[in-house]
């Protein structure tokens, strides 16, 4: 549908955690059936062998470090990563490891600005930040957050900036739709199909 864009499929939880064989099959389906151009895998050193196997199978891989949502339970929730010197060093080392393993790009999520900046400046592959400050090579936000698909009562993460209030617009439209149906104001003749009057009369007589 969009031949000029690079489509990266985010591999779901457990699709690359069990063994290399399953990981290859699942990633291969994204490429062959889903028409993705690449896949994204969360994690650092523990994902090294999977990443290498995918790349050996000619499947481009994007890495993902920092706050990795699929590991949030082990992390104690959605918490910023790399806030101590030792943890920042570990992130830096894992970023280099992913680059050496063959990743063509990397997402850095939920890490201090200075950590993401240091990693970005020392890698030769591009970094994409989400909650990682402004010094990464690119930026991303979840589309639902960006356009405001959730109620204002929902507390967004600190790094989210709403560029719209789609929730309000959607709710307004749905309520108007409901009202029109209940009052028989929709559908009208404008939204309905007709047939020839002679056929219509014959149908009524039949």
Language-model segments: residues:
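Alpha/beta enzyme core
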Residues: 1-164, 168-206
């Amino acid at each position: 549908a969009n031949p000029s864009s690079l489509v990266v499929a985010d591999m779901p939880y457990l699709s690359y955690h069990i063994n290399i064989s399953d990981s290859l099959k699942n990633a291969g389906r994204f490429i062959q059936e889903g028409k993705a151009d690449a896949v994204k895998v969360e994690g650092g050193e523990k994902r090294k062998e999977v990443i290498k196997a995918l790349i050996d199978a000619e499947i481009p891989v994007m890495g993902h470090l920092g706050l990795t949502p699929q590991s949030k339970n082990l992390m104690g929730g959605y918490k910023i990563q790399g806030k101590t010197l030792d943890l920042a060093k570990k992130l830096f080392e894992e970023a280099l490891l992913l680059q050496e393993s063959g990743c063509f790009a990397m997402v850095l999520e939920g890490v201090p600005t200075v950590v993401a900046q240091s990693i970005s400046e020392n890698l030769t592959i591009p970094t994409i930040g989400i909650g990682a400050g402004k010094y990464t090579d690119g930026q991303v936000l979840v589309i639902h957050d960006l356009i405001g698909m959730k109620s204002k009562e929902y507390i967004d993460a600190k790094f989210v900036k709403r560029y719209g209030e789609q929730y309000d617009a959607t709710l307004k439209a749905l309520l108007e739709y409901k009202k029109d149906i209940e009052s028989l104001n929709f559908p009208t003749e404008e939204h309905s199909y007709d047939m020839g009057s002679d056929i219509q009369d014959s149908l009524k007589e039949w």
